[in-house]
Curated annotation (Swiss-Prot):
Residues 154-253 form the SH2 domain. Acts as an adapter protein downstream of several growth factor receptors to promote cell proliferation, migration, and redistribution of actin fibers. Specifically involved in INS/insulin signaling pathway by mediating MAPK1/ERK2-MAPK3/ERK1 activation and DNA synthesis. Promotes insulin-mediated membrane ruffling. In response to vasoconstrictor peptide EDN1, involved in the activation of RAP1 downstream of PTK2B via interaction with phosphorylated BCAR1. Residues 744-748 are annotated as: Mediates the interaction with BCAR1/p130CAS. It comes from Rattus norvegicus. This is Breast cancer anti-estrogen resistance protein 3 homolog. The SH2 domain mediates interaction with tyrosine-phosphorylated proteins. However, not involved in the binding to phosphorylated BCAR1. Required for cell cycle progression in response to INS/insulin. Required for regulation of EGF-induced DNA synthesis. The Ras-GEF domain appears to adopt a closed conformation rendering it incapable of carrying out canonical exchange factor function, this closed conformation is probably required for interaction with BCAR1.
Length: 825
């Protein structure tokens, strides 16, 4: 075979007739060897109709030799003359001037001209591909629904494992691809710790009823209805994909070409070869429409299965099998025929064992339109990956051709209409428990009994007894031994004389604070006292000075655990809260009062520590010593006690503007207590910043925390109109939205790990012997009475904070008067 365009001609393909070998120059010769054959025995075949008859000259040449390649024959050495055999043909591509080429004889087994033209059109269409066209097709894929996997650029389709490993280069890079070893499943490829890792996305099918099912995806813990939802959760929350690897994904690797191009590039298109698959994946490739059943059955095996390339065209009542027959104008249909009744004879895709299908009709003509469904209210969820790329017959309403079984005609459990909350007008066959309709005879016997027990049924429901579910999920898959049981209204009987201990008690919505300063019985304070009494301040300072920093930290932890309801929570309190710990209660709507109490104690504690520092009217060394003792207590709370709540209160006091402006006091601390000053600057301040930026889970092990950081969460949920401290420092950060999300995620973890915090607190306070006076001065009621007096403690919170802010400013200026250049507070 000669080089050039003749190289694309296939070899050894049998046809109906054999011709003698002839040179291409014989087409221009008047003495063609083909003249010996009678042309009447070989009817002409042409893609544009019949060739013009030859009036004079040599016998006509078959169109398969002269016109099948559409002007691809080479020039002769002499200037080519227009032949009467080819003058009416349309050249689709200008011919180059080939000179000096030598031509060999043709293969006697020539391809049918119609099929050869289709193959030539495919190859030419591929050669005409431009980056603009690919970009446009990629944009069309990305504009699909967000729940469609193809609309996400991080989905790369059927690419090999090695290729995906080469795409992820940095820690956090990830992409999703089809599993080549397990068709129908998906794999997440990412890089973590400079190592490419592959995680199979587990696919679980939940049976909602006999005829319907739902697909969910998960890695280890939480499951999702779609893969995009799964990826959004793990990327947004920076959640490790697995506990063993700890891999975190946050940087998607996006594809730059359409999915079909990736499959053809790496040769991973399922069920077809490399040569023909490149064009079959394109929607605008010219294809011949055959109206014969035999031709389509031969072509049916080449249809792609298992990919997501063409699902976007299968909608409505348009037959999906016509996706592979694009050139509809090529077929001549009669007036009474429509495209929906073309005898395409496509086979149904293989169904999963859990879904029953009816056999495909033998007739090549069948209905492809929509059919009404029995359950219009039920949203059928079919994952795009389970049936992707398969030729579907008719619209999506025929994916489950077998309807659910009809109920028994005897309404053996039918009761008169009632306003029961579980009755719903949208109930359908899927809501029926199959165990109900074991036999119609049994149902007929129970009919009269059920009608008589209707009043008892309503009474039982008011008492909290459960009836038949009206939800889309059949929980029988979770009830291993109770699958055969069904709800019997006659069995719902309760003794009015006996009280059910397991009866649900609604939680109590608390409206009054647990801090009652005027009802507080104190051994140190009189029944009525004035704000900031000197004798009380001096006695409290002596107690604070005489005790060790660790002992003070233990007392603070003990009081904090009682206020936050971590320790000493009675059963009655648990029943009224609805939960077992205050750490879970503060995340719930009816925990508002506890959140306000936590804010009150935190602010009161911070103000009391500031007063302890600013109330030292003695020498500069005394103030530095008090500051040193407070920093030591903060270190004990952080390292030994794990009480991050009181730790944040101390750090808040030390970072108040009235304290930070005391330059002489901080200088004296550096001179006399150098090690303490270094610990404060190098450890405590950076650690406090990490806590308020929501990164404590990275630097603080959960096993060492007794009381977590509560203030960011309760502040977000109970923001006051006027706060003592103004906005928190993390709210002034450029990444405040991400920090807020991190605090909310930490709150969820707090509620889940409340039992772990309780055990840690009990372990730390195992050998603790409390001192009554030290415990009293650390209680919130005592501090409120000491700071605002017996009358002022009952005043509005915002008013109290605003007035005390002015008092602290005055005390600070009295200790160290501002210079002329110093800006006023």
């Amino acid at each position: 075979m000669a080089a050039g365009k003749f190289a694309s001609l296939p070899r050894h393909m049998p046809v109906n007739h054999q011709f003698p070998l002839a040179s291409s120059m014989d087409l221009l010769s008047s003495k063609s060897p083909l003249a010996e054959h009678r042309t009447e025995a070989y009817p002409d075949v042409s893609i544009h109709g019949t060739l013009p008859r030859k009036k004079k000259g040599p016998p006509p040449i078959r169109s398969c030799d002269s016109a099948s390649h559409m002007g691809t024959l080479p020039h002769s050495k002499s200037p080519r003359q227009s032949s009467p055999l080819t003058q009416d043909l349309i050249l689709e591509k200008p011919l180059p001037d080939w000179k000096g080429d030598s031509f060999a004889f043709r293969d006697p087994y020539l391809l049918d001209p119609t099929l050869e033209y289709v193959k030539f059109s495919k190859e030419r269409h591929i050669m005409d591909r431009t980056p603009e066209r690919l970009k446009k097709e990629l944009e069309e894929e990305l504009l699909l629904s967000s729940e469609d996997l193809r609309s996400h650029a991080w989905y790369h389709g059927r690419i090999p494992r090695q290729v995906s490993e080469n795409l992820v280069q940095r820690d956090g890079d990830f992409l999703v691809r089809d599993s080549l070893s397990s068709p129908g499943n998906f794999v997440l490829t990412c890089q973590w710790k400079n190592l490419a890792q592959h995680f199979k996305i587990n696919r679980t099918v939940l049976r909602l009823s006999e005829a319907y099912s739902r697909v969910q995806y998960q890695f280890e813990m939480e499951s999702f209805d779609s893969i995009p939802g799964l990826v959004r959760c793990y990327v947004g929350n920076r959640r490790p994909i697995s506990q063993q690897s700890g891999a975190i994904i946050f940087q998607p690797i996006n594809r730059t070409v359409p999915l079909w191009c990736l499959e053809e590039r790496y040769g991973t298109s399922p069920g077809r070869g490399r040569e023909g698959s490149f064009a079959e994946g394109r929607p605008d490739v010219v294809k011949r429409l055959s109206l014969t059943t035999g031709g389509i059955q031969a072509r049916d095996h080449s249809l792609p299965r298992g990919n997501l390339l063409r699902n976007k065209d299968k909608s409505g009542s348009q037959p999906a099998c016509l996706d592979h027959v694009q050139d509809r104008k090529a077929a001549t249909l009669k007036a009474h025929q429509s495209e929906s009744h073309l005898p395409i004879g496509c086979k149904l895709p293989p169904q999963s064992p859990s879904v029953d299908t009816s056999p495909c009709p033998n007739s090549p003509v069948f209905r492809t339109g929509s059919e009404p469904t029995l359950s219009p209210a039920l949203v059928r969820r079919f994952s795009s990956d389970a049936r992707a790329g398969e030729a579907l017959r008719g619209s999506d309403s025929q994916l489950c051709p077998k309807p659910p079984p009809k109920p028994c005609k005897v309404p053996f459990l039918k009761v008169p209409p009632s306003p029961s909350p579980w009755l719903n007008s949208e109930a359908n066959y899927c809501e029926l428990n199959p165990a109900f309709a074991v036999g119609c005879d049994r149902g007929a016997k129970l009919l009269s009994q059920a009608l008589d027990s209707h009043e008892m049924l309503l009474t039982a429901k008011q008492n909290g007894a459960s009836g038949p579910r009206n939800s889309g999920i059949n929980y029988s898959i979770l009830d291993g031994d109770d699958q055969g049981r069904h709800w019997d209204p006659l069995a719902v009987q309760t003794d009015e004389g006996q009280e059910d201990e397991t009866k649900f008690v609604p939680p109590v919505m608390e409206t009054v604070s647990s801090f009652r300063p005027n009802d507080f019985e104190s051994k140190l304070l009189p029944p009525e006292n004035k704000p900031l009494e000197t004798a009380m301040l001096k006695h409290a300072k002596e107690l604070f000075t005489n005790h060790d920093a660790r002992v003070i930290a233990q007392h603070m932890l003990s009081v904090d655990c009682k206020v936050a309801r971590i320790l000493e929570v009675s059963e009655d309190m648990k029943r009224s809260m609805g939960v077992s710990s205050g750490l879970e209660l503060i995340t719930l709507p009816h925990g508002r009062q506890l959140r306000l109490d936590i804010i009150e104690r935190h602010n009161t504690m911070a103000i009391g520590i500031a007063v302890d520092i600013l109330g030292c009217t003695g020498t500069l060394e005394n103030r530095a010593g008090t500051l040193n003792k407070i920093i030591q207590v903060a270190m004990e709370l952080k390292d030994t006690m794990g009480d991050l709540y009181s730790f944040s209160a101390i750090m808040k006091a030390l970072e108040m503007p009235q304290i930070t402006r005391l330059e002489k006091t901080w200088t004296a601390l550096r001179h006399h207590y150098t090690q303490t000053a270094i610990l404060y600057e190098k450890q405590l301040k950076p650690f406090s910043k990490i806590l308020h930026e929501g990164r404590e889970s990275t630097y603080v092990p959960a096993s060492s925390v007794s009381v977590p950081l509560l203030m960011p969460l309760v502040t977000l949920m109970e923001r006051q109109a006027v706060t003592f401290e103004g906005t928190d420092m993390w709210e002034k950060n450029d990444e405040s939205c991400e920090i807020m999300l991190s605090h909310l995620a930490t709150a969820r973890f707090m509620a889940e790990a409340s039992e772990s915090y309780r055990m840690n607190a009990e372990r730390v306070l195992a050998d603790f012997q409390p001192d009554e006076e030290m415990t009293e001065i650390l209680k919130t009621e005592f501090q409120m009475r000491l700071l605002w007096g017996s009358k002022g403690a009952e005043v509005n919170q915002n008013e109290r904070y605003d007035k005390f802010n002015q008092i602290l400013t005055a005390l600070s200026r009295k200790l160290e008067p501002p210079s002329g250049k110093q800006a006023e507070l």
